[in-house]
Design a protein with these regions (language model features):
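Active-site-adjacent structural elements that line small-molecule/cofactor binding pockets in enzymes
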Residues: 1-135
């Protein structure tokens, strides 16, 4: 039996996204197969480092590093209490990727990720949408 699929997909292929920051396996797999890469809750400095590792893996497999869209998960917390309530026991682990401070400080921090090569940001936590809109 043949069935029609209408409307047709916009994309010719489904993009493959790889998430994580493991430098030996995850980033190597991303270099080989990913259309996009996302790393959660890292500092701008760690994003720079992991992005460089991904670039190195791409070069090792003969792939143009610019073929992979690079993104980062970030959270926004107004206060330490907000961070704790959003993430509980994980608060310290995600802290490097949490935007805090004034709107100007948040914008500056986002600029650091942009300078490091982040093309998209994924806001995490219930306060993210409000704070993104305000900043």
């Amino acid at each position: 039996m043949n069935a029609r699929n209408e409307p047709r997909p916009i994309q010719k292929k489904i993009p493959i996204w790889i998430g994580g920051g493991g430098e030996k396996r995850t980033l190597n797999i991303a270099a080989k197969y990913a259309d996009g890469w996302n790393v959660p809750f890292v500092s701008p400095e760690a994003f720079t480092h992991k992005s460089a590792v991904l670039t190195s893996h791409c070069e090792a497999v003969g792939r143009d590093p610019s073929d992979i869209k690079r993104t980062v998960n970030l959270a926004i917390a107004w206060t330490e209490e907000s961070l704790q309530s959003q993430f509980g026991v994980m608060a310290n682990a995600v802290r490097p990727g949490v935007l805090t401070g004034s709107d100007e400080e948040v914008i500056d921090r986002i600029g650091q990720y942009v300078e490091a090569g982040a093309e998209l940001f994924h806001g995490e936590g219930p306060e993210a949408a409000e704070r993104w809109a305000e900043a």
